[in-house]
Amino acid sequence: MSHRFLKRKREHLKTIKPDIYLLGEIWHDASQWLQGDEYDSVMNYPLLSGIHDFFLDKTMKKEEFEYMVNRCYTMYMQQNNDVLFNLLDSHDTERLMNRFHDLDKFYQQLAILFTLPGSPCIYYGTEIAMEGAHDPDCRRCMPWSEIESEENQKKIATMRKLIMLRRNEKVCRSLHFHFPNGYENDRCVEYIKLDEEGNKIEVLLNASDEEIKVKGDGEVLFAREFDGEILGVNGTLIRRM
């Protein structure tokens, strides 16, 4: 669709329903569509690609992850970052679980999704770590007959924990974050989220092949492969500081 058409479409739709949310599916830098007169937001495919690349490519260092995230959040105006449609898989991509076949890596990436600015989106089936290769396999039917299985209920419960963390902790939704680089390990990602009231959480992801001794203390809000001191390989830790 042309920019001219989108501008006229927005003007017409906003006249009918002023609070309508116009979302675009743009796979690259969408700045020219987000000038306030076309889309309100876009699907954040650059963030999806950057997260996947870091976890797929073991040669990438945490500084490259940091650069990617910062780039994604400096491409657009701040009001756009508030409502970016953040996703890890969709009807047009290979499913998240299909890329890694590893629940720990799967939840590491979901922890990122639920602690960065924007609007987290879960593709149907991701709540049970459903697999599926590239289109059309990524659009396979939801296995409703298997939903009540013990394994799937555990996965759904874990997803609910992340959703409730996002909902209950304002700092998870905050726009403010930084990377302190407090660990020497090249693939130990650490970032701090802050809100306007001074609340802080730390997100720690061990994407290396070595265990990491965690520094300091804090209230654990979400964890995998963490025993209270050591964050295991592919471990995740979100804690209040």
Residues of each region from the PLM?
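C-terminal beta-strand-rich structural cap/linker in extracellular carbohydrate-active enzymes
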Residues: D227-M241
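Beta-sheet entry/capping signal
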Residues: H12, D19-Y21, V83-F85, S119-I122, ...
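Aromatic/acidic polysaccharide-binding cleft in carbohydrate-active enzymes
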Residues: Q35-S41, D82, D89-L103, L110-E151
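Solvent-exposed beta-hairpin/edge-strand motifs
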Residues: D217-F226
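Acidic/polar loop patches that form or flank catalytic/metal-binding clefts of enzymes
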Residues: L23-G24, P120-Y124, K170-H176
